[in-house]
Amino acid sequence: MKSDPIRLVAAGLLVCSLLMLSANAYGQSPSASDPAAVGKAVFKRANCVGCHKWHGNGGGGYGGDALSLRTTELTREQIMETVSCGRPGTGMPFFMRGAYDTTKCYDMNRQEVGNQIPPEANTFLRPSDIEAVADYVLAHIKGKGEPNYAECIAFFGNTSRVCDVYKTQATPAAGVAPSTGASK
């Protein structure tokens, strides 16, 4: 019995399509469909935690005393500009390729900003990454008050000992039972 070449090709294409769809469904990181997770991943990858800390309170790092993102009054656009262009005269690096060269920042080019030019980040971010990290800061850090156990677990996961310091601060309202501090 001879095989129908058209049916074989169609069956092969169907199998390949199903394999690609299943690979996308199972291989896709959950962050791709969750904007907050994308922003958090960028916050970690770009090492924002190096100066602003995981909770966004800032307070210092290798670049100096970083501003608190929890108390900032910056708008989304201003956060995006700060991430893109850094902060002249500070240790806050710029994350946009071409900042001060092909793109003016704060209405200045490299010559105009002079020796106050911010450092270049170790890695450049795409515009969509810059938007995602700004959205993450606005949704999960800005205006949130003091950091707590639930926020720490949301950032690091429940296997990190980093969050142990916040256990005594946890309240049932935050969805986490408070620790008594007693050990057995």
Tell me the role of every PLM-derived stretch.
Residues Q28-D34, R45-A46, W54, P93-K184:
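Flexible coil segments in periplasmic/lumen-exposed cytochrome c-class electron-transfer proteins
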Residues G60-A66:
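Short cysteine/histidine-rich zinc-coordinating motifs and their immediately flanking basic loops
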Residues M1-R7:
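N-terminal secretory signal peptides that target proteins for export/translocation
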Residues L67-L69, G91:
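Conserved beta-strand positions that form and line the central face of beta-propeller blades
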Residues A10-L21:
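Bacterial N-terminal signal peptides
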Residues K40, M80, S84, E131-L138:
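Non-transmembrane alpha-helical segments in soluble domains
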Residues L21-G27:
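Sec/Tat signal peptide C-region and signal peptidase I cleavage site
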Residues G50:
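Short, cysteine/histidine-rich loop/knuckle motifs that typically chelate Zn2+
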